[in-house]
Curated annotation (Swiss-Prot):
NCBIfam families: fmt. Attaches a formyl group to the free amino group of methionyl-tRNA(fMet). The formyl group appears to play a dual role in the initiator identity of N-formylmethionyl-tRNA by promoting its recognition by IF2 and preventing the misappropriation of this tRNA by the elongation apparatus. Signal peptide: none annotated. InterPro entries: Fmt, Formyl_trans_C, Formyl_trans_C_sf, Formyl_transf_N, Formyl_transf_N_sf, Formyl_transferase-like_C_sf, GART_AS, Met-tRNA-FMT_C. It catalyses: L-methionyl-tRNA(fMet) + (6R)-10-formyltetrahydrofolate = N-formyl-L-methionyl-tRNA(fMet) + (6S)-5,6,7,8-tetrahydrofolate + H(+). This is Methionyl-tRNA formyltransferase. It comes from the Bacteria. The keyword Mitochondrion does not apply. It comes from Myxococcus xanthus (strain DK1622). Pfam families: Formyl_trans_C (PF02911), Formyl_trans_N (PF00551). Belongs to the Fmt family. CDD domains: FMT_core_Met-tRNA-FMT_N, Met_tRNA_FMT_C. Keywords: Protein biosynthesis, Transferase.
């Protein structure tokens, strides 16, 4: 076929690489993204990154507050899309929109489906201790990331990987999977394959309180969750009734009652967990900068055997 007419739907920085790929692969006739939102301490109304790229390329931008309305479907129909490419748009598409393009809607998802269906696949892959992840290109249906898969691209998860470091790598991989496989799908050469029934794991949206360190849990689990929830919501505990963020930690094999300080010094603050121990390396007291444990201890005496942290 000649250059396909593409409607792109996406919102955050993660989707920018996919949109850039679409500009190479066809004519992007419209971009659908979430409405501008207040951001930062000043609550400055900010456009989504996808919108900024679209406007720089002179592409019409649609920012509906609701998708399930006939007027929006009709507006989209006027662009006569051959395919809709969706990457991290942030909303579930109704059936009439899924069926509107000639070749339906395809989605770039940040996991190896069916593992980690849902809103936070990058975070949960790290939290589960997976050593491999990737992106999946699938044909969308009405379910939550349940559509048949066209292709996958894989990559290793490093032992010290955080969501912050993995995010741009998978975003770039999303652009690659589109460049490599979207043309073959549109030509009919590549057929989607149903997802296997086994191996499904959900990746629900992250809530702020999930960053709280529960020292009754295994240290390995806490260390993974710290990396998974970096940068948001971060890992935190309380000390003396005040918030204490933990930016870097290491799992060890120490033992003791959960929440007990086993050792404290230049090498960190070792806290007993339900299984093993967690050495706190970089900390941020409430209202202050991030600092090494050694600097933190200059103003806070945490003697071995003390229990300054809430265990659960």
């Amino acid at each position: 076929m000649s250059r396909p007419r593409i409607v792109f739907m996406g919102t955050p920085e993660f989707a920018v690489s996919s949109l850039a790929a679409c500009f190479e692969l066809g004519d992007v006739v419209a971009v659908v993204t979430q409405p501008d939102k207040p951001k930062g301490r000043g609550n400055t109304v900010t456009a989504p990154p996808v919108k900024e790229l679209a406007l720089s390329r002179g592409v019409p931008v649609l920012q509906p507050t609701k998708l399930r309305t006939p007027p929006f479907a009709e507006e989209l129909r006027q662009y006569a899309p051959d395919v809709c490419v969706v990457t991290a748009y942030g909303r579930i598409l109704p059936k009439d929109l899924l069926e509107l393009p000639t070749h339906g809607c395809v989605n770039v998802h940040g996991s190896l489906l069916p593992r980690f269906r849902g809103a936070a696949p990058i975070q949960w892959a790290i939290a589960h201790g997976d050593t491999e992840t990737g992106v999946s290109l699938m044909v969308m249906d009405e379910g939550l990331d349940t559509g048949p898969v066209l292709a996958m691209k894989r990559m290793a998860i490093a032992p010290d990987e955080t969501s912050a470091s993995l995010y741009p790598k998978l975003a770039a991989l999303g652009g690659e999977v589109l460049r490599e496989f979207l043309p073959a799908y549109l030509s009919g050469e590549l057929k989607p394959v149903p997802q296997p029934s086994e191996g499904m794991v959900l990746a629900p949206i992250i809530e702020k309180d999930q960053g709280r360190l529960d020292f009754t849990k295994p240290a390995v689990e806490l260390e993974r969750r710290l990396r998974a929830f970096t940068p948001w919501p971060g890992a935190f505990t309380t000390l003396g009734g005040k918030l204490l963020k933990v930016h870097r930690a290491q799992a060890r094999g120490g033992s003791g009652a959960p929440g007990t300080v086993l050792a404290s010094g230049p090498d960190g603050i070792e806290v007993a967990c339900g299984e093993g121990s967690l050495v706190l390396l970089d900390l941020q007291p409430e209202g202050k900068r991030v600092m090494r444990a050694a600097d933190f201890l200059q103003g806070h005496k945490l003697a071995p055997g003390s229990q300054p942290f809430v265990a659960g």
